[in-house]
Amino acid sequence: MKVVCMLLIIGVLMLGCGKICHHDHYGFKATAQFYPENDSIAVGDTIWFTSSVPVKNTDTISNQIINYGGASNFSTDINFNSIEDPLKISEIEGAIDSFSFISMVGSLKENPFEPKGSLAISYSEGSVYYQNLFAFVALKKGIYAVTVVDIENSYKRCAKAYVSLTLSNINKHQEFLKITYYPGSPFGDTIPEIEQTHTYCFKVY
């Protein structure tokens, strides 16, 4: 009986020695880029997408440097759409079938929730950066908008991070978006702020 009691006491003590799981929330900033930065390309030409997120990053909430290595669900979506006058079409069309894709770093797959207009990308973790790199080759003529979505829910044990991904391109060729956004357009008179920082446009001829 004494042995059983001792084992129970030891078990309780061991459970009590476990680390407390802090439900921390972090906000990080990072960039993505499309290159070469041409406003027009020919069918058969290639555009590259690259994004690097530091493993050790400054938390926008606490302003402290956080080591966020070993995180899970470090992934997001990239949306591909044709740019057309909304008054001349019934809905915005996805443009995944206008390109062929080559994944180089990280992973790239069809987004099951939006298979015609979106790809799901996952970052590969290195010692310094989480990275994703892929190429896409133009197959069809048209005017296109590619929008990078922020990483919204990346987890590390009990912690959760939101990563704001803005484009570092000097020229995002957003004059093409005026085809969609103009006075009287059902989508609005002006280009939304989120698209100003997250959308890259180009023409395929």
Residue ranges and their predicted role:
Residues 57-142:
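Structured domain cores in non-transmembrane regions
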